[in-house]
Swiss-Prot record:
Protein name: Small ribosomal subunit protein bS21
PROSITE patterns associated with the record: RIBOSOMAL_S21
InterPro entries cross-referenced by the UniProt entry: Ribosomal_bS21, Ribosomal_bS21_CS, Ribosomal_bS21_sf
Region described as Disordered: spans on this chain: 40-61
UniProt lineage: Bacteria, Bacillati, Bacillota, Bacilli, Lactobacillales
Highest taxon of the lineage: Bacteria
Coiled coil: none
Keywords carried by this UniProt record: Ribonucleoprotein, Ribosomal protein
PANTHER family in the cross-refs: MITOCHONDRIAL 28S RIBOSOMAL PROTEIN S21, SMALL RIBOSOMAL SUBUNIT PROTEIN BS21
Skewed-composition ranges (Basic residues): 43-61
Family statement: Belongs to the bacterial ribosomal protein bS21 family.
GO BP of this protein: translation
């Protein structure tokens, strides 16, 4: 969990920007989106295979 303490003489916008940056660095939001709904193991394998195929084609060209 990301934690941001508002510094002295720091605006709320700046603190929010720091918080968003820390959340994106740790990958918290992506992890949440990935786990938001249950995904069957067969669907996980299919997505993994498709991602590998895309990576392979990307390297080829």
């Amino acid at each position: 969990m990301s934690k941001t303490v508002v510094r002295k003489n720091e605006s709320l916008d700046d603190a929010l920007r720091r918080f968003k940056r820390s959340v994106s660095k740790t990958g918290t939001l992506q992890e949440y989106r990935k786990r938001e709904f249950y995904e069957k193991p067969s669907v996980k394998r299919k997505k993994k295979s498709e991602a590998a195929r895309k990576r392979k084609n990307k390297r080829r060209f």
